[in-house]
């Protein structure tokens, strides 16, 4: 047995704003959005992030999600092919309305920056030579 795809499920307060943000970054929707869900494909490795309305997400969790304004849930790392590409992603994220919580910086042999989406979910772009 093996898994074929991994999905992450997060809450969104505004599906249309989520669509605008991730579309502006160049990610493709995974199917058509509904009134409770929009889904995006990340990278070429079958990683999907579903963004559910807060009410639907709470139902799925059987509990309360974290408050992303004051708490952290996870940081998704997205790979880049070069330091220059990191800088291009930085400008794209800013233009799309993302909030930079960690300015570009060297990390060991790599180069990275961190941002939040409109709902406060944290991501970073990372260049790591040989990765």
Q: At which residue positions do the language-model features occur?
A:
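N-terminal beta-strand motif that seeds the catalytic metal site of vicinal oxygen chelate
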Residues: 1-17, 31, 73-78, 129-131
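Core segments of cupin and vicinal oxygen chelate
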Residues: 9-58
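Residues at or immediately preceding the N-termini of alpha-helices
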Residues: 15, 83-84
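Short hydrophobic/aromatic beta-strand or adjacent loop that forms the aromatic wall/cage
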Residues: 35-37, 73, 110
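Vicinal oxygen chelate
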Residues: 40, 48, 87-131
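Short beta-strand/turn micro-motifs at beta-sheet edges
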Residues: 60-66
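Short, basic/glycine-rich phosphate-binding loops at helix/coil junctions
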Residues: 68-71
């Amino acid at each position: 047995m093996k898994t074929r795809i991994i999905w992450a499920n997060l809450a969104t307060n505004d599906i249309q704003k989520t669509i605008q943000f991730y579309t502006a970054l160049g990610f493709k929707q995974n199917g058509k959005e509904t009134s409770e869900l929009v889904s995006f494909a990340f990278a070429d490795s079958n990683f999907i992030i579903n963004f559910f309305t807060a009410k639907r997400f709470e139902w799925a969790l059987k509990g309360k999600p974290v408050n992303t304004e004051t708490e952290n849930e996870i940081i998704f790392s997205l790979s880049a092919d070069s330091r220059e590409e990191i800088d291009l992603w930085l400008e794209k994220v800013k233009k799309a309305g993302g909030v930079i919580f960690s300015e570009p910086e060297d990390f060991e042999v790599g180069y990275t920056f961190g941002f939040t989406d409109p709902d406060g979910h944290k991501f970073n772009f990372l260049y790591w030579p040989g990765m």
